[in-house]
């Protein structure tokens, strides 16, 4: 029987369904023809609860094996490589066919985030239609090396039979996966044109490890954010165990990195105004922040959440040692150490001498609370007198003083307690543990002169040997002050060996990020940590020694039926002589608790709308529990009508066959006309149905990396790349390209960004085009102000702008052509960045006489001046408040174009402060004595004869570590005299 049929389209805000009508009027869905997945809301790139409910009924969410791998059977037969359910979940959601383009992976320390990213990349790149390569960005070289080694090891163990020999496999890996540090890659972005970046990196699977390092104030964040938005075809994984460290607003840059369009980015100001509710506590000590419903909607479907204690992967019991409910602390277990008389006297002296300078007082009190040298000095002064600055080892006189003429351990420890009761207690604990064959890890902040190396001196005074960790009576001190990265990596390999388990191994690490984030220690039974201002930092440190399968050797030697214990000690030095006074350690723990209350509320909100692996149990002998969607709202009851199974071929193969009838996609440069493309599907190119079909076709082409080469399509006589047609057609009703704007919304102008970027960088060219164009207006003055701001920011931070100050001056007329808040805010941003006051113009349609006419440019109206000045002051005040909260007197700014580093003074209202003419100047123009003072205030040791350039470099690094370094285009640019 011959059937006649026609193709009918039903428009839908989330996807297009295709229905075939047969002669017998029976209607059946075309299986394997078009994707029926829901998609994100185009208005703000967030998922509706209804769409999440639908999405979580599909195979990606419920299957416990990788959906698009032919090697699952072989892989699952090897129990050491069985992916855990939460890893499978993320890998399946980021396949080429999945509508999920980016995920913030908030999985706790020790849950295997590295392997999650590896599986996700392999489950995409190795799949037909997948992306062409992977890019892994890490915070430092040590993490980079560990990530690369793990990926190579996994790939070789699983796919070695795909390659002829080892050389070919290494070549494939080096060509397919790129590794770089975040800062290094950001610098590459800064000096590379957008068109080159797009050509090289489009269709890339991007993984950013420790993504929380990209802060709004950081220099690297705007570069990485801009780079990701250049890519028309990509998947993004942001890995972090601690997305929030100080405030809930730490989530803002992580949200923005996942957005495809700049118009959907949010600012910290918008976040604090619209997405959280603030409630002051009864004592008005701190502000309670609770996420609202808008917060949940913005992050819905963008997060995969799994807490460290949410997995049953730990084959050990975690025991928190110490008391709770002391000194006003509610939840924290504290191991208290009472100051000796000598230490208490010095501590009170510091408090009295620095009472008017609280930030200096806290720094010095932290030094005193750790160790006071025999002559009553502490910090840098004592360190220089009693320690060898080059080797980090104690001088003979310090060892003699610590021993106090005694020879037995107990007497020496009693003597050490006079200088540091904390170090004496920890030393006794780790030695006794070592004698039982138990490993210990001690983490101490690098508090100048009183930190890790001084504690190592205490162990040497007790007769232990500081070495590489091989000797039975030795200990290992991991610190960048005296060891290279290679030496640290080599030492860790020694201490991880199983045969070394019964030997003594002290574990000591400094607060250098490159090692805190890259070191993993196995079979640690005792973990000693210091007080921090946030629990996130403590959690990361503890996680270095407690991870999935980290205690396999301990369990193998365990003789009991119960699980072994791992003990956590949070140390705090207190003063029993002043029971009503909280020491610096207690203050830090209290601050940490307060921050944790707000962070917990945000985590709860995130988990309620996350793609969460609920009930994952990788260590259990029972089958893994499928993931579950823990929705804050269940939304509508959407039935599982996904008629497109995820394993058979769907649109890709059938569509490519039709394309090959018209032209060969295997050639590097090809062209196809819209008319002929639509006729392949028997559609009239001028019909509405054809436009709807073209939407689906173009969207499919763009999301398949293997098709993303130099392909061109004829859009009304303009030959442009397919991806540009796709971007344009997604938001606009016509294919007119590139300059005529009709029916363009705020969210539809993204297609013009690359067309205008060069013009923005060269303003004179843009003005020439405006004067020469007569047939239709050049669209630059019609674009929404948020798009203009994005274009300008792109131009400013690229090397194409030789003088950002003059560029801003030339482009100032394109800001703020209305009287609404976004327009004025854009003008304020421009004035703040340029270091100017009110030197800008506004495009208006109302003259001074109140008569409406065509748009024309006028100078800033007087009614705007006060408002702009106020908003600019508020913007500067926000930065100052942020720095004051860190108890700093100064902060750094860096010009993203020139690389100049400047220092600004935090205003405090004093006459001296107001007269500070140096504030905001380049660091190298400050006096050497002033630089030494600034360095001392942030813990940087500056020698008297140190060159100013070297001093500035050290201060810049410390400001960056303290999140007190901000991008500022006026840094190094001489502002005009008023």
Swiss-Prot record:
<feature type="binding site">
    <location>
        <begin position="107"/>
        <end position="114"/>
    </location>
    <ligand>
        <name>ATP</name>
    </ligand>
</feature>
<dbReference type="GO" id="GO:0016887">
    <property type="term" value="F:ATP hydrolysis activity"/>
</dbReference>
<dbReference type="Pfam" id="PF00270">
    <property type="entry name" value="DEAD"/>
</dbReference>
<dbReference type="InterPro" id="IPR011545">
    <property type="entry name" value="DEAD/DEAH_box_helicase_dom"/>
</dbReference>
<dbReference type="GO" id="GO:0003724">
    <property type="term" value="F:RNA helicase activity"/>
</dbReference>
<feature type="domain" description="Helicase ATP-binding">
    <location>
        <begin position="94"/>
        <end position="261"/>
    </location>
</feature>
<protein>
    <recommendedName>
        <fullName>Putative ATP-dependent RNA helicase</fullName>
        <ecNumber>3.6.4.13</ecNumber>
    </recommendedName>
</protein>
<dbReference type="GO" id="GO:0005524">
    <property type="term" value="F:ATP binding"/>
</dbReference>
<comment type="similarity">
    <text>Belongs to the DEAD box helicase family. DEAH subfamily.</text>
</comment>
<keyword id="KW-0347">Helicase</keyword>
<dbReference type="InterPro" id="IPR027417">
    <property type="entry name" value="P-loop_NTPase"/>
</dbReference>
<keyword id="KW-0378">Hydrolase</keyword>
<dbReference type="GO" id="GO:0003676">
    <property type="term" value="F:nucleic acid binding"/>
</dbReference>
<dbReference type="InterPro" id="IPR014001">
    <property type="entry name" value="Helicase_ATP-bd"/>
</dbReference>
<keyword id="KW-0067">ATP-binding</keyword>
<keyword id="KW-0547">Nucleotide-binding</keyword>
<feature type="short sequence motif" description="DEAH box">
    <location>
        <begin position="209"/>
        <end position="212"/>
    </location>
</feature>
């Amino acid at each position: 029987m011959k059937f006649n049929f026609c193709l009918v389209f039903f428009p839908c805000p989330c996807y297009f369904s295709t229905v075939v009508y047969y002669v017998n009027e029976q209607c059946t869905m075309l299986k394997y023809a078009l994707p029926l997945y829901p998609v994100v809301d185009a208005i703000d790139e967030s998922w509706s609860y209804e769409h999440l409910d639908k999405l979580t009924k599909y195979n990606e969410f419920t299957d416990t094996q990788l959906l698009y791998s032919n090697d699952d059977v072989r892989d699952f037969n090897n129990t050491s490589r069985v992916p855990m359910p939460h890893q499978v979940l993320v890998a399946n959601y980021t396949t080429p066919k999945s509508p999920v383009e980016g995920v913030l992976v908030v999985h706790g320390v020790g849950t295997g985030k590295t392997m999650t990213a590896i599986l996700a990349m392999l489950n995409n790149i190795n799949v037909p239609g997948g992306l062409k390569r992977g890019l892994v960005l890490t915070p430092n070289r040590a993490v980079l090396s560990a990530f690369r080694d793990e990926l190579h090891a996994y790939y070789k163990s699983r796919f070695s039979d795909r390659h002829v020999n080892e050389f070919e496999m290494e070549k494939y890996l080096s060509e397919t996966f790129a590794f770089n540090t975040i800062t290094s890659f950001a610098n590459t972005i800064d000096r590379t044109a957008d068109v080159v970046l797009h050509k090289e990196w489009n269709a890339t699977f991007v993984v950013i490890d420790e993504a929380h390092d990209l802060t709004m104030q950081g220099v690297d964040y705007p570069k990485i954010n801009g780079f990701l938005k250049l890519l028309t075809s990509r998947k993004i994984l942001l890995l972090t165990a601690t997305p929030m460290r100080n405030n809930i607003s730490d989530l803002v840059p992580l949200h923005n990195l996942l957005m495809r369009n700049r118009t959907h980015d949010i600012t910290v100001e918008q976040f604090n105004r619209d997405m959280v509710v603030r409630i002051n506590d009864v004592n008005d000590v701190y502000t309670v922040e609770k996420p609202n419903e808008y917060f949940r909607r913005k992050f819905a479907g963008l997060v995969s959440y799994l807490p460290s204690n949410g997995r049953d992967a730990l084959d050990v019991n975690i025991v928190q040692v110490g008391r709770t409910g002391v000194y006003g602390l509610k939840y924290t277990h504290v191991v208290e150490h009472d100051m000796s008389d000598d230490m208490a006297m010095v501590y009170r002296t510091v408090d009295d001498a620095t009472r008017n300078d609280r930030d200096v007082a806290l720094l010095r009190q932290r030094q005193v609370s750790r160790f006071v040298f025999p002559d009553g000095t502490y910090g840098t002064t004592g360190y220089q007198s009693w320690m060898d600055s080059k080797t980090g080892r104690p001088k003979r006189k310090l060892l003699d003083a610590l021993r106090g003429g005694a020879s037995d351990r107990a007497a020496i420890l009693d003597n050490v307690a006079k200088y540091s009761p904390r170090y004496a207690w920890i030393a006794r604990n780790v030695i006794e543990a070592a004698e039982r064959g138990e490993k210990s890890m001690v983490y101490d902040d690098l508090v100048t002169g009183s930190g890790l190396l001084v504690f190592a001196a205490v162990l040497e005074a007790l007769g232990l040997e500081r070495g590489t960790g091989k000797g039975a009576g030795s200990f290992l001190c991991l610190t960048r002050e005296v060891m290279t990265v290679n030496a640290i990596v080599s030492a860790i390999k020694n201490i991880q060996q199983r045969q070394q388990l019964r030997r003594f191994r002290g574990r000591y690490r400094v607060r250098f990020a490159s090692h805190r984030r890259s070191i993993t220690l196995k079979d640690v039974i005792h973990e000693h940590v210091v007080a921090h201002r946030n629990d996130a930092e403590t959690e990361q440190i503890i996680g270095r020694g407690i991870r999935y399968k980290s205690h396999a050797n301990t369990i193998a030697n365990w003789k009991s039926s119960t699980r072994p214990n791992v003990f956590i000690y949070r140390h705090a030095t207190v003063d029993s002589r002043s029971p009503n006074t909280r020491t610096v350690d207690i203050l830090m723990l209290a601050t940490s608790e307060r921050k944790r209350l707000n962070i917990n509320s945000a985590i709860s909100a995130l988990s309620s709308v996350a793609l969460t692996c609920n009930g994952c149990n990788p260590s259990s002998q029972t089958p893994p529990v499928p993931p579950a969607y823990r929705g804050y709202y269940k939304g509508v009851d959407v039935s599982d009508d996904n008629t497109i199974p995820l394993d058979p071929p769907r649109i890709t193969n059938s569509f490519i066959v039709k394309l090959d009838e018209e032209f060969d996609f295997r050639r590097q440069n090809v062209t196809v006309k819209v008319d002929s493309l639509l006729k392949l599907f028997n559609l009239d190119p001028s019909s509405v149905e054809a436009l709807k079909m073209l939407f689906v076709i173009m969207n499919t082409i763009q999301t398949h990396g293997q098709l993303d080469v130099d392909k061109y399509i004829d859009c009304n006589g303009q030959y442009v790349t397919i991806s540009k047609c796709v971007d344009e057609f997604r938001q606009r009703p016509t294919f007119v390209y590139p300059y005529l704007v009709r029916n363009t919304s705020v969210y539809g102008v993204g297609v013009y960004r690359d067309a205008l970027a060069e013009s923005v960088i060269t303003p004179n060219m843009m003005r020439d085009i405006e004067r020469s164009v007569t047939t239709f207006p050049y669209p630059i003055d019609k674009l929404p102000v948020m798009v203009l701001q994005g274009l300008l920011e792109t131009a400013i931070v690229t090397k194409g702008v030789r003088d950002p100050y003059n560029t801003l001056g030339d482009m100032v007329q394109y800001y703020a052509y209305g009287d609404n808040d976004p327009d004025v805010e854009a003008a304020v941003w421009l004035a703040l960045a340029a270091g100017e006051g009110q030197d800008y113009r506004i495009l208006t349609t109302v003259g001074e006489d109140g008569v409406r006419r065509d748009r024309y440019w006028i100078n800033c109206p007087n009614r705007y001046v006060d408002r702009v000045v106020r908003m600019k002051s508020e913007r500067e005040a926000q930065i100052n408040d942020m720095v004051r909260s860190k108890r700093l007197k100064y902060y750094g700014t860096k010009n993203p174009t020139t690389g100049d580093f400047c220092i600004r003074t935090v205003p405090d209202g004093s006459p001296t402060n107001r007269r500070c003419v140096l504030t905001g100047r380049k660091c190298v123009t400050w006096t050497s004595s002033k630089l030494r003072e600034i360095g001392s205030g942030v813990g940087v040791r500056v020698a008297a004869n140190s060159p100013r350039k070297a001093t500035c470099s050290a201060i810049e690094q410390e400001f960056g570590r303290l999140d007190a370094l901000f991008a500022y285009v006026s840094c190094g640019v001489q502002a005009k005299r008023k």
